[in-house]
């Protein structure tokens, strides 16, 4: 979703780059878990500590939401903005689902994956 070809290309390349980073990290952790059964516990504790340290960050700031909405809307009409808003909501849901799936692949239970995903800082970090 982009208002012009350059932004569309940049967005696609950034998404591909992020997917590679996540795939590498998950593959590395998955292999590490095989050799260190306590790693999942330490990762769990790390997520909780990070959440506690950053708990003042309660969500995406409005400027980020507005920018994402405008980029995905592709226009200024009420209909386009509504579509953009729906797409941003779907993006956030898809990111949660993706985090949960990656955590399941690492060996966390469904409940642990849901809890850890919920603790994720809601600012795309």
Where are these regions (language model features)?
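Aromatic-enriched hydrophobic runs in primary sequence
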Residues: 1, 15, 23-24, 35, ...
